[in-house]
Structures are given as C-alpha cells and as structure tokens.
Amino acid sequence: MNRYFSIPAGLAALLLASVAAPAGQSAPSVESACGQLTCDIETLFEAGLADGDVAQPVGGGVPGLNFFDAALTLARETGNSAAEARALNHMGAAYRRVGRYPQALERHRRAIAIAPSPQIKGESLNGLGQVHTSFGRISEAVAAHQQALELFTQANLSTGMADTWLYLAAAYEEDRQWDTALTAYETSLEQAEGDAGRQAAALHGMGDIHLEQDRLKAAVASYQSALERWRDVGDDKGIQTTLTRLGGAYHLQRQYDMALTAYKDALAISRTRSDLASEATLLQNMGISHGRSGDWDPALVKLYEAAALFEELGYRALEGETLSQIGNILKAQGNQELAIALYKQAIGVFEDVRQDLRVLPLEQRSVFPRTFAETYRTLADLLLQQDRVIEAQAILDLLKVQEVDDFLDDVPQTAAPDLGTAPLRPAETQLLELYDQTVAEGRELAQLRRIPRSQRSPSQQQRIAALVSAQQTKTAEFNDFIARPEVSTLVAQLGDTSRQQNLNLRNLNSLQDNLQTLNNAVLVYPLILEDRLELVVVSPYSPPLHRTVEVTENELQAALETARQALNNRHRDARPAMEQLYNYLVKPIEADLAQANAQTIVYSPDGPLRYVPLGALYDGDQWLIERFQVTNITAASLTDFNAVPNPNPSILAAAFSEGEYNLQVGTRQVSLAGLPYAKVEVTTLVDKFADATQLLNDAFDRPTTIPQMDDYSIVHLATHAEFVAGQPEESFILLGDGDRVSLRDMSTWSLRNVDLVVLSACQTGLGGTLGNGEEILGFGYQIQRAGAKSAIASLWSVDDGGTQALMTTFYDNLRQGQGKGNALRQAQIALITEDRQVLETNQRGFAQEFSGPLPNLPNTYSHPYYWSSFILIGNSL
C-alpha cells in the first residue's frame, strides 16, 4: 500500500470484466435485470457485477449478492455445476470486498469442492487466495495461487496463468516483498500478451511497486503505459484508478499541477460512474496537493467537500482523516485555535468509530499512511505549545491506544475500551457549530449526489447546479467566517490558558488519587516531536506540567540505538550511553520529582523509547532503578492501579527446554532451540508455590495451556517470544510443541482471574534498527484487554542463567508480600549489588537439575544486560 494517497486499490477488480450500470442509474433488482420470470445465469452474473462495480455506503449490505444468490439457485435447479461454482466464487468475492472474510472463505471452498474443470477449480483457488491476502495470511494465499497456477499451466490456459501471477504479485506486495512482487507482475505482463486489459492491470501493479520503492519516474512510466491499454479497451474504471495513482506519483515528485490534472480527469470519470466513494477520495487527494503547493483556499474547499461525502456515505474513519487534514491546513495558516478544534473533532470520530476502516470495501482501503495516531500527536503538540497540559495528557493517553490500534489493525476489537474523546471546551464547541453552518452546503450537495441521475427531480438538478457554481465562492465564505467578530471572540477565549484548568478535572483528580496510593508515584509521558522532546509530568499534589527538551527526533533516535547496543553487549560499559539518555529523559524533571517526593515513576514511553528500559538510565552515580520503582503502562485510562492481587497466589509455569523448531515468520526463516535453563526456571518456581502446575515441552501445547491459564493468578511462560514491528501475526510466543500464538491470537484469550503474566525470554527490536515499539505496546494492550492486571516481559532474551537468578529472587520477594513493582525492583538491585545469596541460590538450582557438568555461569550479573531487560506493564501492586 502506498503511504500517501487514497485510491480504489483492488487490482483484482481491474482484471475482471465487470459490466457497469449506465451512468446515473441505480443498480437493478433481479426482476428488472431479467425482465421476465426466468432469467439466464450470465445476465444475473452481469447484473451482480454491475451492482458491485462501485463502493456502496457503509451498512448497505453486500453489493451484487442477491443476483449471485439467484444465479446459484438457478444453477442448482438446472444441474449446472460449472455455473454453481462460478456463482459461489462471485459470492466469495462480494463478501471479501466488504470485509466479511469467513463467509468469503466458505464460498470459495465450496466452489473448489464442486469445480468440474481445471479452469473453474483454478479460479476458485485464486478466489480463496485473494481472501487470504486480504486477511494477511500470505503463506496460505501463495499456496492457493500456486495450486491454481499448476492447474492453469497443465491445461495451457494463458489467461488463467496471467491472472494468477497478478494475484500472486498482490499477495507478495501485501507482504512487502517488493522484488518478488515486481517479478510476478512482469510475468503476468508476459503471459497476457495480446490482452490489453490484463496487461494494463499488470503495468498498474508494476507502477505501484515502483511507487513504494520511490522509483517515481519508473512509476509514472508504468502508469502511463497502463493508461494507454485501459483506453484501448475502453475500461473507465481502470482509467480512473490508474489516473489516481499517476496523480499520486506526480505529487511525490512535487509536480502538483500535473497531479491535480490527473486527479481532475479521474474525478470526471468517477462522477459519470456515480462512484461517490472514489469521488470523495479524489477530492481529498486534490485538497492535499493544493495544500502542499500552498494553495490553501482551494485545498480547504476540496477537503470540505470530501469530508461531507465521507460523512454522507458513512465512511467515518475517512471523514475523520479529512477533518485532520483540514486541521493541518488551518495550523499552517496560523489558525491554531480553530485547528485544535478540528483535530478534536477528528479524534472524536476516530474514537467513536474505531472499527470503521475494517468494514470498508477492499477497493476503498486508503493507501494514505494509516497513521491516525499522527493526529493525536499533532494535537498534543499544539496543546503543549499553549500550556494546556491537562488536555494534552488526555490526548497522550488516547494516543497510546490509537497507536496499538494502528498496529493491530484488523484484530477484532469487540471489547475495545471506552476511553472517551478529546474533550471540547465551550468556545471550541461554538466554533465548530459555526464551522458546520459554513460548510453545510457541502453536505447538502453530497446528499443530492447520492440520488441516481435518472431519479432526480428537475428541482434537485437545479439545486445541484447552483451548489456546484457556489463552490467558487466557498473560499470567500470561509475567510469571512474566520473574520467574523464572534469567531474572533471565541478564538481569544481559547487563547486564555488560565481557563484550561477547569477542563476535565474529574479525570485528573481520579488519576492523582491513584498516584497517591502508589507510594508517591509520578506519571511521566514523553512525547517525541520532530524538533524537540516534551516531558509531561502528572504528580499527586499539583497541576500537570511539561518540560521541553531541546533534542531532535533524529538525535534521540541515535542515542536510543546506541543505548540499546550498549545494553545488549554484556562486555561493554553501558554507563556513558545510559547517562546520555538520563540527561534527555530525567534530568529535566529532576526538580519536579524531588518536589513530589516521588518514589515510583509510572512511565508511558513514546515510540522507540519503548525499546530501552527506563530503570537502566544512569545519573552518573546510580542506575535509576536504585532510586525509583518503575512501572510501564499502556495508558493510564486502561490501567486499574488499585487492583489488589490474590493473597494466595497460584502459578501455571510452562517451558520449552528441549528440541528445535524451524518456523516461517513472515519473510523470515527462524530456527528456535529449546532453552536449557528454562526447565530449571520453572521447576524452581513450582517448588515455591503450594498451588502450582508445570508444563514442559510437548505438554506445553495450545489445547492444554490456554484453557487453564485463567485458573491461576500467575502465568509464567519460559519460552521464546518475539515481538517485532510489522504484522501482528509476526509477533508470537512459541509453545513447547512448536506451535505458536500470535498477537492476533491473543485477542481471544480470557485472563480475568490472572494477576500477572510473565514472559521471561522475549526479544524485541530485532534487526538492529529500532521501530516505534508498537509491538511492545501491542503485547501490553492485548494482555490487559484479556483481563490480566499486569505483565512482565523481557526486552531481550538473557541466556547463561541471568534470567533464572532474577526470576527466582523476584518470586521470593513476591511470596514475602512485596508488590509486583517492588519485588521486581529489589530483584534487579540484588543483581546490581552482586548479592551473594542470590548467586549461590542460582548455582544450587542448576546443580540440582543438571546431572552432568554445570553450565559455565557468570561470576556477576551486575551489567544491565542481565537485570534491566525485564519491564513491568500495568498494575504494580
């Protein structure tokens, strides 16, 4: 997916010859399509494809399904198994386009089972593969398409081979295997020799790959070649789609006039096709190109129109995105107060309809950067610039949840928490009401355009014409709006920061009460911005405050990568690198921590800060964990700070200690061997608890482990786990039998009775380049969402006995009545100070479990490599 521009993206739809309804006409019913009591199957197929040719409003059912269902019935009545399989495939494609993947899979599998010929079976397998691609199951998609390719090759069906290579390319593209995808598109192009439509689809796909890899000239050339072929076959939908992509390529080359020309031509086609969703997308793109070229007024006009259309169609996530883009332009114009109001309105949409993107038709998936979180980040930045710290803290809390939602993407959010929205101040509410009045005509135009042209009354046609001509005056109207006295008064009120303390005080008071119960805790929210670092501090007894640190995002990123390398190398002195980070993250708030008499830091790290444990920062004399207890949180609003743990803890301890498994994880081949120290770890833990169950290796499987986790207050998993940036299914916990549980799978866990989940051999930040830590955030979020109060995870896997030393001490502290946060801190301090009792206990544990020579254990575990990897997420009691 391209990072910048929204387009109808389904290449498969470009390939299939769909019969569009005549411009301006509504989709026919089965009766009107047939014109008689009986109807031939091909007519029903054509009518169904026409019905689904353009994206429908949200909640409008499954376009084309009634026609395909009628065709299925007719095929069965006439004993036509080929038509029956084709009808099932059409139904599967219709379900896929609206995101109903289980229903789509079921139809394609039924088609495969009854397919009477290699051609139809291959088509059915390709349909199945497309659903897997849409669902992110790339290996399954590739397997299905390769089976189809074998069938088409054996039958010497060149069109089937060309289609299949196109679908394979789309799967590889979804998996970001750019070179493999490009090769597949090129192969499809060769196979489609003499077929201009199929060649156009392949060339369009090649342009997408070039665009993703910033080969902009090559992208333009591919799109132009595709356009020639679309025009040769008269495919308006293909022309519209490729023009939209071509506009995106021109935009990235900063050739904004050419981009706007391409968008304008595509817009004209979308209007003749009554494709309102594409029309809204193109208006949005035009607004962005106008904005990038500094043409603020036409940019605002186009974005207002796009927002109105998205709202009318029910695509509320895209509506919110467009409102955010309007906020960007207002911010660039210096209208910060109005920009803040628009950002808050956008966030209100995002929070209200968090699942919207997942139910959009596949062709309408935006290829904009799907980073709704950037709106939260920009709003927090503006609020902090105006010292509106209470509001900024609330937005930062929402930011964490939006970031994890962006990462988890299509993980079911059936139990998503209600965190509220960005609270509007009275003046902002009034501003938005005035704004709504100003842009109301855009909404009216959107409503009228939803009426098919053949069904519009003369008065409606006249009203549309009047509204279109009035678009030229909208700029002046909005400028007049900005200058209105009542607007100026409201903006002045918003500039009075002395009033902001009255906002959202109930939530602040509740948060401060929680901090008081946590041993004088202080909540710290860092916010990484391009030109600086902001530290937001909430203490129990004073208003929130923020401190600005003059360090750029690039400088901080470099310092974090250096720190992570130092922490991972036990033979390197980590103190200089960790002191540099201390100077950025803690030194600016030292006085604030002292004034609050802080003993605990509740930490909500931002972006790559998630890869470096706060407790490992060094002040020149001590590690931070020696001074403060540190607890990480996903978001304050998701954390039950006061939940008291079970006074009679029970433990389920599982380990993978023997064997080796080779796994395909995304594009990586991973070989993972049993952890020789893991058996010692869990055996020692089981001996410490009266109510304990141990699962080793093959017994540590999915059917045995997951159902009984909620029967224990502590779940301890001593096995490989990798949390990596990318797709949620690429982050996983390895089970003892070689199976694995992904972050996606964890959404179904139930852990309501669990106080603590421990993963003692996690790895993050693999590959040496730090991402934004969304996978770490995602793990904490999923565990809390499943009901567990807290989790302990390692940021890197520690071998040679260090984990066992720390875990044994941690559980000893826990059994003595210490809270989870303090128990972990004291265990870490024991390793820092080289507590002899800890080392001797660790040696004895290995002596009891190893019948042969003892492993060569270190003489000291004082390096932060051994003790700082483990972070506590959530409740610390």
Model-identified regions with their sequence ranges:
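Amphipathic alpha-helical protein-protein interaction segments
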Residues: E337-Q622, F641-F656, E660-Y661, G666, ...
